[in-house]
Every structure is written in structure tokens, then in C-alpha cells.
Amino acid sequence: KLQGLSYAEIAARGGGILNSADRLHETSEEDLFEQTMRRAEEIWQKGTGCVEIKSGYGLTTEDELKILRVAQRVKAHSPLRIVTTFLGAHAVGRAYKGRQSEYVDLVINEMMPRVAAEGLADFVDVFCDEGFFTPEETDRILEAGEKYGMKGKIHADELAFSGGSRVAIAHGALSADHLE
């Protein structure tokens, strides 16, 4: 992305969200914690006082929980102020290719209740854009998040006008990123 490539070009070269999810799946929770603590210490030393840690690179229930559990551990061991965001709807996990509505149900009915039960996230975020999640799916996910006490955020309209900005407004989202 920093080299000006589109998401499609990055994916064609073997990168992107799904590639990152594969790599995260292979990383133990302890290794992820150690890596994240090193980064937290580095940014603290450079003057950062507050940081948001998002999930969204797990795309399975266990891997999304792993990311957020690590975030909570870092929060407990770092002087940084850390806020956490559940972004299970960053992309459709590989196991659900061609079954997007089932993946949305997984996010709402399995992932989100577990995230809430463990108190792992302050916010819920959705990538509402062409090729990712529709405004209707985004609406369902944000509504579910509200029921669990997670204020909504949204990534939208980066690749095309998706209508995500309207969903953000309808839900009083805390932030709406991209909107290009």
C-alpha cells in the first residue's frame, strides 16, 4: 500500500489481509505478545501516549480472540493508554470464501459474544467497501456491537462509494476512515 499498489494488486502478489491472517495464525500468542510489547515500548520511547490495537487479521474466532487477548496483556504491562477494537469484519476468512453471509453470522453470533464476554474490545469496526462488506452487513454488525456495548467505527468508501458513510452516520459511529 505504501508503494501505491491497490488492494487487488497487493493480493495478486500474495499479500493483503488474507496473507497477514495466514501469518498471524502461525504465530503463537506468546510470540505475538512479545512482538507487540517490543513495538509498544518503541512507540512509547518515541513519545506516543495512546494507541489503538485492532484485531482484523485473525478472521477466525480463535485468532481474533488471540489478537485481542494479546492487546489486553500489553495494556496491563505497558505505560501506554491502549484502546482495543474488534475488527472481525475486515475481510471474509478463507474458510468462508463464497459464503459471506455465513461469515457475517459468525462475526455476530460467535465472535462478538465471546469478545464481549471476555471484555476484550472497546469498539467494533467494519470494512464496508466494494469487495468486502455491504452496507446491510455493516449495519447488522454495528447494531450487534451496540448491543454488546461496543461503539461503532467504520472503514468505508476507499475503493468505491459503498454507502458505508451513510451507515456510519446512521449509527453515530465514533469514526469513519478513508471516505475517499
State where each predicted segment sits.
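Active-site-adjacent C-terminal substructures of enzyme catalytic domains
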Residues: 150-152, 158-180
